């Protein structure tokens, strides 16, 4: 028998060998901090997409996209000769993964090209949509990212079918491998019903945070009903929770549901069991395409995607008010699609009100509604909104256009990041607007006023940190710009120690007013000054980089409700947990670090510096391994790695560090502190900063990382 053993010492497939995380599943997974580095990016260090996209011929692209919509390809024919519905679903399912709790998901990175999204059950046949777009991506090359093209395709699809769109902004940069930091749920199977192993539901029907979709592999809700059981009122509850977690209110929810279903159709005219493997599991000859039906025709009218079959409206390639006309003026009953999926069909309907077949325009079939569509009619609050839209088509079109813009731009950050000729002039509250601040002032003079105040190093560093730490690299919200730390709700957050914060602001705000500069700048400048003072106390003269120009947001520019999701519930850098959580403190710190956009090395040096600067919450001394608090020394690392010490737990998250010889208690520490000595990777970094010859390197690296955090939301500097 031939020896089929792999002829090389390594494996290219996952079944060949176990990963470290499989051998030691409780180990800290630092991979989420190492993703998206230059080694995976084929464009090179000098490539700047945001500059390249400014060279894009937008009008030519728009013309090409309009032409593509009606250029039906025989390998994947367009329904009714128009790809609009398919392209809208592509854009929608890219943007619809966004959730407010952690800002992850969304259309901003082109992540739908990679697993798991490229193979989700809800994304069946969207691989075909991306292949249809490939000639345009190929043509426009580096001037057009996949992320921008996917989002733009849906917008132009609506425009081509008659909707007056609200606008569009370019500037989404592609990633080059799957995102490892996004938690999609703990279920072990696709479309696992409630109560399955790892279920995302508890209690009556409480959806686990930060999740927004109701099932593993769905973008929103189950179109057949809760766990596949039709009941529009129960589905309405799922819809409301899901869309709220995507930052949509009831009116926006109805608009998106109706507008998304005004055009296009569901596909379920066949046997779903005949579909081939998903893209990520398909064989090489399928070239990245999935769900191929090799037993039957499987395209055109015989396509199977969601399993439901039919269009929602009479004219599914035309923007109109037909969705409400049919939904509200007919009685509906449950039927099964050819693929066996539950769907609602009208009991009595005129033949001319039925949509025609996608291939034979002489044949007509019943329109259909999903369980979520029926919720728009039967839920009392949704019904009122639906009736309003039905009576005022222009109002509906305007609300939908604005909401579609919000959906496709929610994770792009502030308006200063928008690029292109079709950027709306209006400022929208959900964009967290911040006015431009002054940059033409004497920075050193302002710094001198701060230095002359009574504020300590701890006060200034802590306040600057608290202001900046809200930044999320996921949806680019938060940060120090705007100084919203002085406004509701942030001023009253427990994490910000309101009493201390108010005392510090009482000193800094008058300095800002007297100098005619923003409070945002003064808060950061004070933090920088404190770091410089601490470095000097450690024997090093260093200047922290500072770029003036931050503005101060007002209460009118701040949607208080939307900022609740940015409230810190933990902060490893200040050694604080609001309460005990099922997730370990070090894992929470890792998540915080990833959202801040920091690497494992930056996390290490930043935390070590914060510990010796006296920034712990409420003045706690845990992890402050130094006798020189307020001086930017490497004492945290020196004492953490000192084998003359022993470490003993005294409670779940508290440890005592004692002298090995005398047993004298020296310090206390938390899990977050000790993980930098226990995790092999973090210990390697800690040892670098503990070295006798790296004290200056520690100071320099801390300053670099500190400045990075302070400027994380300064998109005007890009």
Swiss-Prot record:
<feature type="cross-link" description="Tryptophyl-tyrosyl-methioninium (Tyr-Met) (with W-92)">
    <location>
        <begin position="220"/>
        <end position="246"/>
    </location>
</feature>
<comment type="similarity">
    <text>Belongs to the peroxidase family. Peroxidase/catalase subfamily.</text>
</comment>
<keyword id="KW-0479">Metal-binding</keyword>
<feature type="cross-link" description="Tryptophyl-tyrosyl-methioninium (Trp-Tyr) (with M-246)">
    <location>
        <begin position="92"/>
        <end position="220"/>
    </location>
</feature>
<keyword id="KW-0376">Hydrogen peroxide</keyword>
<dbReference type="Pfam" id="PF00141">
    <property type="entry name" value="peroxidase"/>
</dbReference>
<keyword id="KW-0349">Heme</keyword>
<dbReference type="InterPro" id="IPR010255">
    <property type="entry name" value="Haem_peroxidase_sf"/>
</dbReference>
<feature type="binding site" description="axial binding residue">
    <location>
        <position position="261"/>
    </location>
    <ligand>
        <name>heme b</name>
    </ligand>
</feature>
<keyword id="KW-0560">Oxidoreductase</keyword>
<dbReference type="InterPro" id="IPR002016">
    <property type="entry name" value="Haem_peroxidase"/>
</dbReference>
<keyword id="KW-0575">Peroxidase</keyword>
<dbReference type="GO" id="GO:0020037">
    <property type="term" value="F:heme binding"/>
</dbReference>
<dbReference type="GO" id="GO:0004096">
    <property type="term" value="F:catalase activity"/>
</dbReference>
<dbReference type="GO" id="GO:0005829">
    <property type="term" value="C:cytosol"/>
</dbReference>
<dbReference type="InterPro" id="IPR000763">
    <property type="entry name" value="Catalase_peroxidase"/>
</dbReference>
<keyword id="KW-0408">Iron</keyword>
<dbReference type="GO" id="GO:0046872">
    <property type="term" value="F:metal ion binding"/>
</dbReference>
<dbReference type="InterPro" id="IPR019794">
    <property type="entry name" value="Peroxidases_AS"/>
</dbReference>
<comment type="subunit">
    <text>Homodimer or homotetramer.</text>
</comment>
<protein>
    <recommendedName>
        <fullName>Catalase-peroxidase</fullName>
        <ecNumber>1.11.1.21</ecNumber>
    </recommendedName>
</protein>
<feature type="site" description="Transition state stabilizer">
    <location>
        <position position="89"/>
    </location>
</feature>
<feature type="active site" description="Proton acceptor">
    <location>
        <position position="93"/>
    </location>
</feature>
<dbReference type="GO" id="GO:0042744">
    <property type="term" value="P:hydrogen peroxide catabolic process"/>
</dbReference>
<comment type="function">
    <text>Bifunctional enzyme with both catalase and broad-spectrum peroxidase activity.</text>
</comment>
<dbReference type="GO" id="GO:0070301">
    <property type="term" value="P:cellular response to hydrogen peroxide"/>
</dbReference>
């Amino acid at each position: 028998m031939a020896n089929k053993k792999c002829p090389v010492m390594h494996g290219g497939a996952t079944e060949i060998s176990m990963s470290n995380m499989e051998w030691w599943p409780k180990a800290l997974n630092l991979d989420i901090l190492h993703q998206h580095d230059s080694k995976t990016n084929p464009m090179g260090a000098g490539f700047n997409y945001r500059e390249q996209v400014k060279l894009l011929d937008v009008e030519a692209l728009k013309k090409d996209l309009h032409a593509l919509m009606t250029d039906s390809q025989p390998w994947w024919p367009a329904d009714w000769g128009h790809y609009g519905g398919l392209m809208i679903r592509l854009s929608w399912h890219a943007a619809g993964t966004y959730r407010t709790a952690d800002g992850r998901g969304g259309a901003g990175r082109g992540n739908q090209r990679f697993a798991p999204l490229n193979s989700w059950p809800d994304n069946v046949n969207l691989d075909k949509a991306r292949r249809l777009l490939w000639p345009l991506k190929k043509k426009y090359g580096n001037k057009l990212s996949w992320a921008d093209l996917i989002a733009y395709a849906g917008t132009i699809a609506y425009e081509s079918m008659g909707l007056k769109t609200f606008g569009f902004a370019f500037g989404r940069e592609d990633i080059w491998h799957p995102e490892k930091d996004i938690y999609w749920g703990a279920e072990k199977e696709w479309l696992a019903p409630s109560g399955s192993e790892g279920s995302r539901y508890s209690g009556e029907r409480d959806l686990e945070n930060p999740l927004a979709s109701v099932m593993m592999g769905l973008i929103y809700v189950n179109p057949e009903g809760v766990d596949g059981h039709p009941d529009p009122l129960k589905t309405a509850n799922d819809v409301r929770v899901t869309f709220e977690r995507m930052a949509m209110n009831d009116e926006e929810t109805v608009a998106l549901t109706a507008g998304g279903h005004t055009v296009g159709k569901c596909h379920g005219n066949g046997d779903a069991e005949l579909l081939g493997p998903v893209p990520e599991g398909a064989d090489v000859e399928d070239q990245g395409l999935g769900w191929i039906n090799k037993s039957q025709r499987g395209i055109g009218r015989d396509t199977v995607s969601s399993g439901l079959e039919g269009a929602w409206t009479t004219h599914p390639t035309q923007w109109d008010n037909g969705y409400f006309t049919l939904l509200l003026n007919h009685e509906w009953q449950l039927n099964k699609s050819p693929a066996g999926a539950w769907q609602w069909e009208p009991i009595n309907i005129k033949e001319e009100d039925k949509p025609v077949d996608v291939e034979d325009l002489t044949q007509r079939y019943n329109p259909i509604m999903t369980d979520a569509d029926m919720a728009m009619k039967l839920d009392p609050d949704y019904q009122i909104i639906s009736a309003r839209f039905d009576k005022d088509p222009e109002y509906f079109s305007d609300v939908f256009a604005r909401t579609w813009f919000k959906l496709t731009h929610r994770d792009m950050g502030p308006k200063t990041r928008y690029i292109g000729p079709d950027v709306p002039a209006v400022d929208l509250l959900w964009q967290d607007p911040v006015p431009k601040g002054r940059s033409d002032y004497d920075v050193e003079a302002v710094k001198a006023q701060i230095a002359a105040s009574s504020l300590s190093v701890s006060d200034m560093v802590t306040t600057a940190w608290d202001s900046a730490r809200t930044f999320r690299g996921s949806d680019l919200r938060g940060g120090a710009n705007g100084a919203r730390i002085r406004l509701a709700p942030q001023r009253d957050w427990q994490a910000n120690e309101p009493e201390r914060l108010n005392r510090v602001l009482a000193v800094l705000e008058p300095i800002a007013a007297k100098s005619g500069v923003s409070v945002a700048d003064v808060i950061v400048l004070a933090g920088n000054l404190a770091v410089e003072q601490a470095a000097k106390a450690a024997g090093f003269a260093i200047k922290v980089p500072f770029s003036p120009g931050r503005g101060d947001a007002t209460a009118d520019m701040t949607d208080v409700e939307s900022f609740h999701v940015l409230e810190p519930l933990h902060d490893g850098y200040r050694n604080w947990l609001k309460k005990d959580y099922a997730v370990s403190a070090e894992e929470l710190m890792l998540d915080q670090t990833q959202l801040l956009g920091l690497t494992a090395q930056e996390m290490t040096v930043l935390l070590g510096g914060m510990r010796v600067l006296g920034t712990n919450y409420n003045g706690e001394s845990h992890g402050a391994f130094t006798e020189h608090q307020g001086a930017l020394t490497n004492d945290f690392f020196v004492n953490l790695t000192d084998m003359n010490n022993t470490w003993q737990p005294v409670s779940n998250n508290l440890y005592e560090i004692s002298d090995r010889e005398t047993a004298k208690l020296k310090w206390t520490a938390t899990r977050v502190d000790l993980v930098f000595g226990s995790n092999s990777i973090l210990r390697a970094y800690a040892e670098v900063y503990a070295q006798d010859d790296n004290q200056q390197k520690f100071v320099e690296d801390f300053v670099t990382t500190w400045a990075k955090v302070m400027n994380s939301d300064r998109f005007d500097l890009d």
